[in-house]
Curated annotation (Swiss-Prot):
Positions of ATP binding: 6-13, 132
Cited function: Catalyzes the phosphorylation of pantothenate (Pan), the first step in CoA biosynthesis.
Reactions catalysed, as given in the entry: (R)-pantothenate + ATP = (R)-4'-phosphopantothenate + ADP + H(+)
Annotated binding of K(+), by residue: 129
Name of this protein: Type III pantothenate kinase
Database matches in Pfam families: Pan_kinase
UniProt similarity note: Belongs to the type III pantothenate kinase family.
EC number, as in UniProt: 2.7.1.33
Gene Ontology molecular function: any one: pantothenate kinase activity
């Protein structure tokens, strides 16, 4: 079995693959202050709760946009699983050609998403990831990573409202049903949800105009279903795109079950 670990700024997602199939997955809060032992105990408890034998893990792959956690999780996997993880970064084979001014600047999560989406759907593609940041990337018909856009995520945009506007309350992330809100909460929900729908539609249109092709639009991330249900610009929702990409990269680099 292969353990894939995707460390984001807000959440860390783990998945176990067996014979090309995702058989178990978890989402926890990312905490760079946890020690290797704390993460180790947490992982083992999750495995035990799902009746998964951690001793049957044959390989581990790790992607992180939080640099301090790479060292912590490497210590954890070495100590508790007796395995050195493959860390996604420069020098790792991905099968994707990064057509960027500085390929080293591309986030590991974006590379992993591009690998998964191209492997599963072919190209050309636009990939939208609703995470701490909302990221867009374009992949050519030949599997080249062409570049992208980075916008604030839904969560941090809403947090800015709460933090800088004293009278605005925290609101539940849900579709208000109409754009013209009849109260403060509905107005905020409209601005947050429909505002992000507009962001997605505008950037996807600009990407399509610049690509001069008809790409398929794939969306992933924690709040993807909320936005995808309000627009026709998203063709497919793939909640496990990043984990799948990690698994494909593990196989490309010789980590097999």
């Amino acid at each position: 079995m292969i353990l894939a670990i995707d460390v984001g700024n807000t959440n860390t997602v783990m998945g176990i693959y067996k014979k090309d199939k995702l058989i178990q997955h978890w989402r926890i809060s990312t905490d760079k202050n946890k020690t290797p032992d704390e993460y180790g105990i947490l992982f083992l408890n999750l495995f035990n709760s799902a009746n998964v034998n951690y001793k049957r893990i044959d390989g581990i792959i790790l992607s992180s946009v939080v640099p301090p956690l790479v060292r912590i999780l490497k210590k954890m996997t070495t100590r508790y699983f007796n395995l050195e993880p493959l860390v996604v970064g420069p020098g790792i084979r991905t099968g994707i050609n990064l057509k960027m001014d500085n390929p080293r600047e591309v986030g590991a999560d974006q590379v992993v998403n591009a690998v998964a989406a191209y492997h599963k759907y072919g190209g050309p593609l636009i990939i939208v990831d609703f995470g701490t940041a909302t990221t867009f990337c374009a992949v050519s018909e030949r599997g080249e990573y062409l570049g992208g856009a980075i916008a604030p995520g839904i969560g941090i945009s809403a947090e800015a409202l709460y933090s800088y506007a004293a009278k605005l309350p925290r609101v539940e992330f849900k579709t208000p049903g109409q754009a013209i809100g009849k109260n403060t909460v509905a107005g905020m929900q409209s601005g947050i949800i429909y505002g992000f729908v507009g962001l997605v539609e505008a950037l996807v249109k600009r990407f399509k105009d610049e690509l001069k092709e008809t790409p398929e639009v794939i969306a992933t991330g924690g709040l993807v279903s909320l936005i995808a249900s309000e627009t026709d610009e998203i063709d497919k929702v793939d909640p496990f795109l990043t984990l799948d990409g990690l698994y494909y990269i593990a196989k490309i680099n010789g980590i097999v079950e």
